[in-house]
Amino acid sequence: MTPSVLIDSDVLVWLTRGHEGAARRLQALPAWRISAVTYIELAQGCRDKADLARLKKGLAARNTEIVPLTEDISLRAAELIDQLALSHGMRLADALIGATAIALQATLITANVKHLSAVDGLSFEAFLPYPSMCNRGRSQIRPPR
């Protein structure tokens, strides 16, 4: 059985910028799953209706599951904000996406290691897009603590 993964917004942004490491990693996935928050962030980044149509077409081509927010996800995100906003700069979108991955028991593929590495119970795969991050777009996986 293929492990469950959730793709963070930042990795999809790298993909749209033509990053080969992002393309390679995402092509390896049999199916894509994103949080509703990720979809909203991507849609907000569209410049016009044609851009939005391309986004929707691209996500549909990959049979992307957009995971809706639930009460449990919202409550867990609020806990993450309480625990990590002041100490680690946790922001709303990151808390909601992290809480979604926890609720799904999915590994979150993300470049946002700074905020998400402190989240207990979150399994994440660090996508490191910059050569200065030591591994030129390859990933490192951390199981949940």
Regions found by a protein language model. Give the residues of each.
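Active-site neighborhoods of divalent-metal-dependent phosphate/nucleic-acid chemistry enzymes
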Residues: 3, 65-111, 133, 137-145
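Short loop/helix-cap segments at secondary-structure boundaries that form the rim of catalytic
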Residues: 23-27, 114-121
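Generic structural signal for small/hydrophobic residues in well-ordered secondary structure
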Residues: 8-9, 42, 77, 101, ...
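Short, well-structured N-terminal submotif of metal-dependent ribonuclease cores
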Residues: 1-34, 44-58, 131-134, 143-145
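Alpha-helix capping/helix-boundary segments
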Residues: 11-12, 38, 73, 96-97, ...
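Nucleotide phosphate-binding site architecture
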Residues: 12-13, 40-43, 117, 125
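Short beta-strand->loop
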Residues: 70, 121-131
